[in-house]
């Protein structure tokens, strides 16, 4: 089983020396992945409900501070040599498809094949509108075309695509990514359509566990969701072994328990023994890569959380 760290790139950790220190420490501790969230701009008025809180309020909406995800991953790539670089997740409608394929491919080349592209359709309508993305109601269909275009651009000698949201032909797109046939694509999202997208397009399924409308915050719920992904993949003629089972436990908390929407203890919160049992239970149901939420408040708190997870959890599995 592999483990990783997820960070929002804002606040005290969004500083070059701090990011470099965190990345090198994560690599030294043996984490397999370092991932960053994706916001480009924050609207002055955010009315879109945040999927991962009961209230629907996004905890960072009062500040417009955020570093751009792909640029930050390029910076981290130059500071590290082993750890995989994860877009956790990249919101597909935020960027034009050809440019996105070029930027991600460039990171894969410069990192010598260490990029994993986690993708999602996004939740903040205002941000997608500000970035001149597709209509919010069309973002799922547009994202499917973008994903198809990414693979086409990454792999074909003479790429071309004709769709409703993406059209191109007559272009050269070199060099190709280091990873063959392309960097792994992990499909984020918890809803039924996201699970279907993972089955159709994904090299991995990468949900966040604490979506109140589609929770995977218990091993049983996660196992059921993964089974649905696998069943849909088989119907499409794919092998389930081609789909990595991931999870973002953004709510990880050692020492204090949180509750699910049913009043039960939320997985990956509580004592070290409870969290170890959670990891084992999820692993038994197919989980392969667990990414925990990092600590954004300051450098020392972030380093402490990584070291604590290594010594209190990983070393006892």
Please state what every model-predicted region is.
Residues 1-317:
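Active-site-adjacent structural elements that line small-molecule/cofactor binding pockets in enzymes
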């Amino acid at each position: 089983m592999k483990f990783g760290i997820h960070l929002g790139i804002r606040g005290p950790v969004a500083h070059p020396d701090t990011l470099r220190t965190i990345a090198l420490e994560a690599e030294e501790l043996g984490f397999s992945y370092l991932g960053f969230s994706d916001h480009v701009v924050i609207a002055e008025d955010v009315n879109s409900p945040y999927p991962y809180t009961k209230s629907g309020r996004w905890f960072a909406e009062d500040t417009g501070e955020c570093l751009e995800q792909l640029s930050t991953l390029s910076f981290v790539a130059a500071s590290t040599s082993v750890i995989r670089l994860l877009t956790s997740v990249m919101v597909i409608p935020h960027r034009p498809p050809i440019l996105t394929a070029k930027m991600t491919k460039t990171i894969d080349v410069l990192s010598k094949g260490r990029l994993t592209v986690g993708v999602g359709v996004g939740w903040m309508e205002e941000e997608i509108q500000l970035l001149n993305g597709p209509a919010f109601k069309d973002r799922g269909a547009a994202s499917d075309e973008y994903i198809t275009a990414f693979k086409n651009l990454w792999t074909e000698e003479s790429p071309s695509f004709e769709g409703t949201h993406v059209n191109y032909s007559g272009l050269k797109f070199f060099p190709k990514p280091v990873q063959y046939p392309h960097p792994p694509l992990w499909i984020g999202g918890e809803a039924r359509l996201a699970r279907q997208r993972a089955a159709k397009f994904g090299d991995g399924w990468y949900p966040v566990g604490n979506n109140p409308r589609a929770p995977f915050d218990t091993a049983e719920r996660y196992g059921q969701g993964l089974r649905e992904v696998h069943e849909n993949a088989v119907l499409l003629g794919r092998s389930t072994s081609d789909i990595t089972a991931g999870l973002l436990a953004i709510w990880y908390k050692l020492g204090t328990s949180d509750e699910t929407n049913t009043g039960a203890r939320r997985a990956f919160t509580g004592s070290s023994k409870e969290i170890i049992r959670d990891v084992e239970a999820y692993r038994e149901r197919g989980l392969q890569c667990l990414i925990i939420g990092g600590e954004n408040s300051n450098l020392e708190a972030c380093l402490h959380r990584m070291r604590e997870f290594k010594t209190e959890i990983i070393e006892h599995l």
